Amino acid sequence: MILITGASGNVGREVVKQALAVGLKIRATFQSPAVAAKAPAGLEGVIMDYAKPETIRAALHGVEKIFLVAPPVRDLPALEANFVKEVRAAGRKHIVKLSALGGRESMFPSGHRDSEENIEASGLPYTFLRPNGFMQNLVNYNAGTIRSQNAFYGCQGNGAVSIIDIRDIAAAAVIVLAATGHEGKSYALTGGESLINEQIAEKISRVAGRKISYVDLPAAELKKGILSTGTSEWSADALIDLQRLYCEGKASLVTDDVERLTRHKPIAFDQFARDYAFAFQDEAKVAS
């Protein structure tokens, strides 16, 4: 039995989909019964709260491997530490942790490093998957202004990023979960090319059928816009700090880890843009 945490999130949902497609026996965790009720057929859904050890213990019963993904919040290391404590008590189970590319130089990956070090110290078998930024973030966070303003915003200047399609992250995760030989290893998961936002805007323009622009803003102005969406202060600061990392060129690394794990090249941004073209349609035309 494989436990997939965060099954309603962007990556967790895709891991569930691909795990079911290859016939893996999985249990998936959800935050509420309402969300669990919408889970696909073929899996066992359970409610789990990282702050409630009894729910973690119930989720771990009979499990051999775990895909661990916690929400991107300030207390991520503490939440995952609670989980790891219960895993140790339940026996020697292999944790496949969704981490992040980068080190201590930025808030978000730094929290993942804390969690990784705790897992290493636990003595449990582990594998760390460290992806770069997600292509799908353009759909989740930027599609609204792309549709309504023909533009998306950031503060990363000309910093290039080897962004990766979530579908490739999930494919790598399923392979690690389904096989042995990955214990004690870390994989840096990136796309096959490093792109600046102007290049991304050009590629989206082609599938959208109109000109889409990238607008670079001062960090303070961008943060103000992020906060206006209801995002927490910490999350806004973490996003701005991550863009600083991008601006400094520290996220441009391209690796072959996706291809080595999955035996296929990473999904190209052009393919991603075609697959998600519906998300970038002109809002005025859709309304008419």
Q: What are the functions of these language-model segments?
A:
Residues M1-A39, A51-V63, P72-A81, K85-H94, ...:
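Oxidoreductase cofactor-interface core, primarily capturing Rossmann-like NAD(P)-dependent enzymes
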Residues E44-I47:
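Conserved SAM-binding strand-loop segment of SAM-dependent methyltransferases
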